[in-house]
């Protein structure tokens, strides 16, 4: 009996080390950033079983077999749609400003279409204004309404939006609503899904959380886009979820969430519509390609129209494009670069681009919330401050709530607004969307918003920062090491 126990023990030990060796080899063979690989290896060697289970669950990008097959199947029809859209030459910009040209050329080469012109944009900073405008647009809708959000939290004005959407469906408007399963868990546990479906709205729970399939699909891959399209002509996107900030996370101790949304009219709605149709097909298997822009209602003749490029990320979309866009924007800056983000855990390349911009004389500012709803990200962000301050970057800590706006402004002319946080999850994993806008007028509007944020912020003093306690430095370095995984 002792011999059997000994044999079993040796086999268990051998299997244990073979498993560690196999996972180690898999990590090394994957094309990933060195810091990310090193962080995973450290976890696996310190906490082997926990590390291996965690890596198999969230260490690699698994969309899931069924969704991956749908993503592959949709691209021939999507590519044909994009090729047909090119026939509408009047909607595409032929020239861009010097600061925006490199980024727009990158997007055109990687996504297959140029930026679209003739759009009218309106920046909106108050959630009440956004929802009231949206309710009016829903009430005036004639054909279709499509929405996708990471979070839909019942309560307050979000319920008024839901009521108006159901009223639209009852009068024959085709309404589709896609919500992330994890982000909108409160919504899916409420009566609202059944009420909406009974009214005729197609409601889809995207990327359902299922612990039984944790090793078949990455559970922390999330649908993080916030988009609304109405009648192939009106569109919204930005950082705001479908929540009333007066009712949302009031016990988090960070204050109300501060967001930014853009309301648009023009062919940009079509460009965003194809992104939505791809998401819808990946999730449901149903194809809903949008119609081409209606030349009879598009404001092409208006010289004040904005030129916009949509940048989409996520499985099935051009790999690393949003990361490349941010790098290109940083390297294109000559006068100033202003960034706002709630979660700042940049890649080494992005950190280097930001610091290099400051070191070559660009006025670089980063606006972050002083209080963060994620302790891990908050500490990890601090680990980058010393290097940023040494390079001459100004760090503003916003004190008026949780600044949730995601924006970049380059030389007052190139603007980036959307859903992308400056962290690994947004840059490499989630379904995200960013708008690149080449327009001085819009840049001035965004600059005014960012100036308002700065007026409600505290500038981080480099000398005081260097005097912070030793325990804070240790905590920052610890979280910094694991930052590639956050």
Curated annotation (Swiss-Prot):
Keywords: Cell inner membrane, Cell membrane, Lipid biosynthesis, Lipid metabolism, Membrane, Phospholipid biosynthesis, Phospholipid metabolism, Repeat, Transferase, Transmembrane, Transmembrane helix. It catalyses: 2 a 1,2-diacyl-sn-glycero-3-phospho-(1'-sn-glycerol) = a cardiolipin + glycerol. It comes from the Bacteria. The chain crosses the membrane at residues 3-23, 38-58. CDD domains: PLDc_EcCLS_like_1 (cd09152), PLDc_EcCLS_like_2 (cd09158). GO terms for cellular component: plasma membrane. Residues 219-246, 399-426 form the PLD phosphodiesterase domain. GO terms for biological process: cardiolipin biosynthetic process. One of its GO terms (molecular function) is cardiolipin synthase activity. Its main location: membrane. Pfam families: PLDc_2, PLDc_N. It is a multi-pass membrane protein. It is found in: Cell inner membrane. The active site is at residues 224, 226, 231, 404, 406, 411. InterPro entries: Cardiolipin_synthase, CL_synthase_A, CLS_N, PLD-like_dom, PLipase_D/transphosphatidylase. Its EC number is 2.7.8.-. PANTHER family: CARDIOLIPIN SYNTHASE, PHOSPHOLIPASE D. Catalyzes the reversible phosphatidyl group transfer from one phosphatidylglycerol molecule to another to form cardiolipin (CL) (diphosphatidylglycerol) and glycerol. NCBIfam families: bac_cardiolipin. Belongs to the phospholipase D family. Cardiolipin synthase subfamily. ClsA sub-subfamily. This is Cardiolipin synthase A. It comes from Shigella flexneri. The lineage of its organism: Bacteria, Pseudomonadati, Pseudomonadota, Gammaproteobacteria, Enterobacterales. The gene is clsA.
